[in-house]
From Swiss-Prot:
Name the UniProt record assigns to this protein: Probable histone-arginine methyltransferase 1.3
Annotated EC: 2.1.1.319
PANTHER family (UniProt xref): HISTONE-ARGININE METHYLTRANSFERASE CARMER-RELATED, PROTEIN ARGININE N-METHYLTRANSFERASE
Organism of this sequence: Arabidopsis thaliana (Mouse-ear cress)
Induction comment: Targeted by PQT3 to degradation via 26S proteasome. Induced by proteasome inhibitor MG132 treatment (at protein level).
Function: Methylates (mono- and asymmetric dimethylation) the guanidino nitrogens of arginyl residues in several proteins involved in DNA packaging, transcription regulation, and mRNA stability. Recruited to promoters upon gene activation, methylates histone H3 and activates transcription via chromatin remodeling. Positive regulator in the oxidative stress tolerance that promotes the expression of enzymes preventing oxidative stress such as APX1 and GPX1 by histone methylation (H3R17me2a). Confers tolerance to cadmium CdCl(2) and salt NaCl stresses.
Cross-referenced InterPro entries: Arg_MeTrfase (IPR025799), PRMT_dom (IPR055135), SAM-dependent_MTases_sf (IPR029063)
Post-translation changes: Ubiquitinated by PQT3.
Assembly and interaction partners: Interacts with PQT3 in the nucleus.
The encoding gene: PRMT13
Chain residue ranges for the region called Disordered: 494-517
Keyword Ubl conjugation: yes
Keywords: Acetylation, Activator, Chromatin regulator, Cytoplasm, Methyltransferase, Nucleus, S-adenosyl-L-methionine, Stress response, Transcription, Transcription regulation, Transferase, Ubl conjugation
GO cellular component terms, A-Z: cytoplasm; cytosol; nucleus
Length: 535
């Protein structure tokens, strides 16, 4: 049997200037102490023993965290509960070294022993993954988490977000305009990424900022922060998930950019409220504070034809001798299960929008697992309704200034754009007609949501009071798999120039069937003669 890498490490001891319990109210002792790394009964431990006391502080390195407060001053914290239930408290000690060399050597040993501890405890004897997973790991599939953290661990994607000047500029303004909320306060940056929000908080006068980042971007954040010495000593980068890590103190302010497409995509809002419950003081503030999902029905004939024609490829009866039509229905359903991400003209909306509010200071993590939104609109025009358009905004409720960050159509475009759920069966509506429905979001383990959308046009005129339904259309969408249309032309070409070169012999009518021209002509005839009536 192979000897564990932990067992191969020799027991190490370090002489310390002093060690004191964080929870102790007594004056710190100046008596010397000894720190010992050891492997006991299958567990890697770090023990602190004061020379004038028999009391020993024991830490399981699998859950221990080390924080640097100065050249020779550190804090070590760890889970203080031995139960398998959710961690509810932590224990910690103040550590002071005799010199910087001792502190550096200790930190290197701490990382080496802790990493080996994680490797040793990651699998069971039969090779299966340990059941001792974090809350995040229990609800998110490993492949999705790996791709997610890989994506956000790359600088090019961080640059994409930093260059969203609406996003970055609004955060900067919200922090600086409310500097009194940050000055002298402890701040936690949830999902810190490059660390830009942590540096905003430090510029606003934060006493200390804990930048928590689970991806490899944490290393870039350390490098970037170190290159800005004006506030580098007030920012500590912690690599890990907020569900797993421990902090040496409570936070007065939480700051984060947890919003995804449709506000909730990527399910980071759950981590945001978990950080609130674990780290924030009862009277702390959250930046952002609330979010709103805005919704309105829309009419866009060009988009509908574009999506319908994508599936027409599968209508070919002689594609290199193969009949593709058996898959047409599945292809059509697949295209219309993709939410469309793009920027659209707000004049395409056929009713005034409504919104659903999410209060980050009050929402529980479980409240994000299923979100049910009843819909009710009044059509403002006679047209064909093609689906539901959605966008979001968030509020930074500072003590001095309340500032909104919006992704609304017609406003400056952000990297979130807007999202539209297109019905495979559009509905005709008349001006003044009531539109009802339901937007039902169910979270899944791929860090996204399944969307069930139903829209109905209620009877109008004399029978409206009876509440009868004239038409109804339902579609299911996967928010994880959108159709990114940002670079696509917003108008569908209604005619094409004849080809300059003759087509290959296979491209004859009997070989490759063209889209149903009669259907396309019928759809295009629905376009209003006066463009302003539609837009």
């Amino acid at each position: 049997m192979e000897v564990s890498s932990v067992k191969k490490l020799e027991q190490l001891e370090y002489s310390l200037e002093s060690v004191t319990d964080l929870s102790s109210s007594s004056v710190s002792s100046s008596s010397p102490a000894v720190a010992t790394f050891s492997y006991v009964d299958g567990v890697t431990e770090l023990r602190f023993l004061q020379s004038d006391s028999t009391h020993c502080f024991n830490f399981d390195l699998a859950s221990a965290q080390l924080f640097k407060l100065g050249p020779v001053h550190f804090i070590c914290v760890s889970d203080g509960s031995s139960s398998s239930e959710e961690k509810s408290f932590s224990k910690g000690v103040n550590i002071k070294f005799k010199n910087e060399k001792d502190s550096k050597d200790f930190c290197e040993s701490f990382e080496e022993w802790r990493n080996d501890s994680v490797v040793q405890g990651s699998s069971l004897q039969n090779g299966t993954v340990s059941a001792n997973k974090s809350k995040f790991d229990n609800k998110i599939e490993a492949s999705s988490a790996k791709m997610y953290f890989h994506y956000y661990g790359q600088l090019l994607h961080q640059q994409n977000m930093l260059q969203d000047y609406v996003r970055t500029g609004t955060y900067y303004a919200a922090v600086m305009e409310n500097h009194s909320d940050f000055a002298g306060r402890v701040v936690v940056d949830v999902g810190a990424g490059s660390g830009i929000l942590s540096m905003f908080a430090a510029q606003a006068g934060a006493k200390h900022v804990y930048a928590v980042e689970a991806s490899e971007m944490a290393e870039y954040a350390r490098k970037l922060i170190a290159g800005n010495p004006l506030f580098a000593d007030r920012i500590t980068v912690i690599k890990g998930k907020v569900e797993d890590i421990e902090l040496p103190e409570k936070a007065d302010i939480l700051i984060s950019e947890p919003m995804g497409t449709l506000l909730v995509n990527e399910r980071m809002l759950e981590s945001y409220v978990i950080a609130r419950d674990r780290f924030m003081t009862p009277k702390g503030k959250m930046f952002p504070t609330v979010g709103r999902i805005h919704m309105a029905p829309f009419s866009d004939e060009f988009l509908f034809i574009e999506m319908a024609n994508k599936a027409m490829f599968w209508q070919q009866q002689n594609y290199y001798g193969v009949d593709l039509t058996p898959l047409y229905g599945s292809a059509h359903q697949g295209y219309f299960s993709q939410p469309v991400v793009d920027a659209f003209d707000p004049r395409l909306l056929v009713a005034s929008p409504m919104f659903h509010m999410i209060d980050f200071t009050q929402m529980k993590e479980e409240d994000f697992y299923e979100i049910d939104i009843p819909l009710k609109f009044t059509a403002s025009m006679c047209t064909r309704m093609h689906g539901l358009a959605c966008w979001f905004d968030v509020l930074f409720d500072g003590s001095t200034v309340q500032r909104w960050l919006t992704t609304a159509p017609g406003a400056p475009t952000t990297h979130w754009y807007q999202i539209r759920c297109v019905l495979s069966q559009p509905i005709y509506v008349m001006a003044g007609q009531e539109i009802t429905g339901r937007l039902h979001l169910i979270a899944h383990s791929a860090q996204s949501y399944t969307i069930d959308l139903t829209l109905s046009a209620k009877m109008w005129g004399p029978g409206a009071s009876q509440g009868g339904i004239l038409q109804s259309s339902t579609c299911k969408f996967d928010l994880k798999e959108p159709y990114y249309r940002m670079s696509q032309p917003q108008a569908y070409p209604v005619a094409q120039e004849p080809p300059l070169q003759p087509q290959p012999e296979l491209s004859t009518q009997q070989d490759i069937q063209t889209p149903n021209d009669e259907l396309e002509e019928e759809l295009l005839q629905q376009l209003p003669q006066n463009p302003s009536a539609q837009l």
